[in-house]
């Protein structure tokens, strides 16, 4: 089973906490021990926002700010690589070809951002499409997809299951509201819809949830099912030991 795991920077390393990075590395190693091929994409989180904010005050333009964000995601990727040790490719992949090659030779591929103007949400979806992944999992700081930003709307509805087309519509609505934050961005949602990759969005602050979702189909997040299929999201779990 080929899996792409997208880990938000604030989920992986809040405050650059080594124990949290180690715990996520342990979760990924457990997946590979169970026979999964894994590609991990790491976001920038609060550290990236801090750097971008300071650079903006110093007069950097938007492309330069995006480049700083990409650089920080790759630093976070290096933290995860350090925790994974010899099971991971030794440096962050800088494009999808490098990541795919690492996965084919049996390494854990780890990458951050790729180009300016594209989030690691979208990078994760593109990597899943490029590698023909069986599953794309977003480990975020919220427990799935809601009808609105749950941090802004206490009455936001939590979805346990939706189609990729419905995901696109929901994310588009959320992103129209200034100040609201979606668990994945609109480009990522559109790539998920195009590729038909099965997707889970969940709260990944406890990395055990990542393992349980991938290996056993057990989670409290949101299953995103390819349009036009009625197959259960957790169809692969029956084949796990």
UniProtKB/Swiss-Prot annotation:
Q: Where this protein primarily resides, as one coarse class?
A: cytoplasm
Specify the pathway: Pyrimidine metabolism; CTP biosynthesis via de novo pathway; UDP from UMP (UMPK route): step 1/1
EC assignment: the record states 2.7.4.22
**Superkingdom of origin:** Archaea
Q: Does the keyword Nuclease apply?
A: no
* GO cellular component terms, semicolon-separated: cytoplasm
* Reaction(s) this enzyme catalyzes, per UniProt: UMP + ATP = UDP + ADP
Q: Which CDD domains does this chain map to?
A: AAK_UMPK-PyrH-Pf
Pfam families reported for this sequence: AA_kinase
Which residues are involved in binding UMP? 44, 66, 114-120
Keyword Cell inner membrane present in the record's keywords: the answer is no
The record's GO molecular-function terms, alphabetically, read: ATP binding; UMP kinase activity
Q: Which UniProt keywords apply?
A: ATP-binding, Cytoplasm, Kinase, Nucleotide-binding, Pyrimidine biosynthesis, Transferase
Where would one find coiled-coil regions in this protein? none
Could you say how this protein's activity is regulated? Inhibited by UTP.
Q: What class of enzyme is it?
A: transferase
An individual GO BP term? UDP biosynthetic process
Instruction: Detail which positions bind ATP.
Output: 9-10, 45, 49, 140, 146, 149
Localization per record: Cytoplasm
What this chain does, per the record?
Answer: Catalyzes the reversible phosphorylation of UMP to UDP.
Q: Which family does it belong to?
A: Belongs to the UMP kinase family.
Q: How does it assemble?
A: Homohexamer.
Kindly provide the name given to this protein in its UniProt entry.
Uridylate kinase
Q: What is the lineage of its organism?
A: Archaea, Methanobacteriati, Methanobacteriota, Stenosarchaea group, Halobacteria
């Amino acid at each position: 089973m080929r899996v792409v795991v997208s880990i938000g920077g604030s989920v992986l390393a809040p405050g650059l906490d080594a124990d949290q990075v180690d715990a996520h590395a342990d979760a990924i190693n457990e997946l590979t021990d169970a026979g999964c091929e894994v590609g991990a994409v790491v976001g920038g989180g609060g550290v990236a926002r801090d750097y971008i904010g300071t650079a903006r005050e110093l007069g950097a333009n938007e492309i330069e700010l995006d480049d700083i964000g990409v650089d920080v995601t790759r630093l976070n990727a290096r933290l995860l690589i350090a925790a994974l040790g010899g099971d991971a490719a030794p440096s962050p992949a800088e494009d999808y070809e490098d990541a795919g090659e690492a996965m084919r030779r049996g390494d854990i591929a780890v990458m951050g951002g790729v180009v300016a103007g594209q989030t690691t949400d979208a990078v994760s979806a593109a990597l899943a499409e490029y590698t023909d992944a069986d599953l794309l999992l977003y480990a975020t700081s919220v427990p799935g997809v809601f009808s609105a930003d749950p941090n802004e709307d206490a009455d936001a509805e939590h979805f346990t299951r939706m189609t990729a087309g419905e995901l696109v519509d929901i994310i588009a609505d959320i992103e129209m509201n200034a100040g609201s934050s979606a668990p994945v961005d609109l480009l990522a949602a559109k790539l998920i819809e195009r590729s038909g990759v099965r997707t889970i969005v969940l709260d990944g602050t406890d990395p055990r949830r990542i393992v349980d979702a991938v290996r056993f189909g057990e989670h409290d997040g949101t299953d995103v099912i390819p349009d036009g299929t009625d197959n259960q999201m957790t169809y692969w779990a029956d084949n796990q030991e």
